[in-house]
């Protein structure tokens, strides 16, 4: 099993990327980690080179580059070389914390989408109060979607939740402005009608965004514009909430500070619950092989989690199963 890694992509590359590999190596002894980038810089942070292949590259795609132009002009970039390795069969999957647009473009152009999938989608596992988490897609790969795109997303998300996260008959829901069947845009209503008739999907109907963190569904489907807005609202709320709680305690009386010290452990549990470090990266589902995007400011723990996520994807052959499923649907 080989995972190609863009070692130069991300805000803290290559340090956090390589340190994440060091952590993942301890648990994933059956994986060869291919690190693409500046070999000298990569070796500064490697514990050792067991199960490591370093592939020298001379270019880096940054967040300001136009994705399509960068893929075509920077062919020796760490990102393009890593994705190309998957295309050529030299690696089984790819991970990058670099430019989202460039990775999605490279995935589409090089790895290719599953033929019968109308639109691949960006999907991530987000936290819930019960600790189970939920998968939401699309998170921004597509800004506008048809009802049939949403139906494909539901199938992709359901297969991922069942095969990678081990959820039996995952509950699939559509984001809408009300739980009632009559609520939602024409696109959502059409998707609702189609999904309701599909026996292979455990479709539970509509869900409102206020109920997401309560664990009301295992897979949540929406268009890319809405999904990206919800994701950023959740991230922003979690950050502000923890900051304001800390500020209120520090600005309070001695009694308040003592109380804050007493609830330090529960607050730490809350912080861990809202953290995405252990959830892995955002998977670009609907492609012929796993392509995973880690957050640009990922910690080494987040990188290690993303690598373990990819390992599960490869072990369960979720991409292969999706290819087979959509081929059957096409007949």
UniProtKB/Swiss-Prot annotation:
GO cellular component: cytoplasm
Known catalytic reactions: a fatty acyl-[ACP] + phosphate = an acyl phosphate + holo-[ACP]
GO biological process: fatty acid biosynthetic process; phospholipid biosynthetic process
GO molecular function, one term: phosphate:acyl-[acyl carrier protein] acyltransferase activity
Enzyme Commission code(s) on record: 2.3.1.274
Chain's role: Catalyzes the reversible formation of acyl-phosphate (acyl-PO(4)) from acyl-[acyl-carrier-protein] (acyl-ACP). This enzyme utilizes acyl-ACP as fatty acyl donor, but not acyl-CoA.
Subunit and partners: Homodimer. Probably interacts with PlsY.
Family the UniProt entry places it in: Belongs to the PlsX family.
Protein name: Phosphate acyltransferase
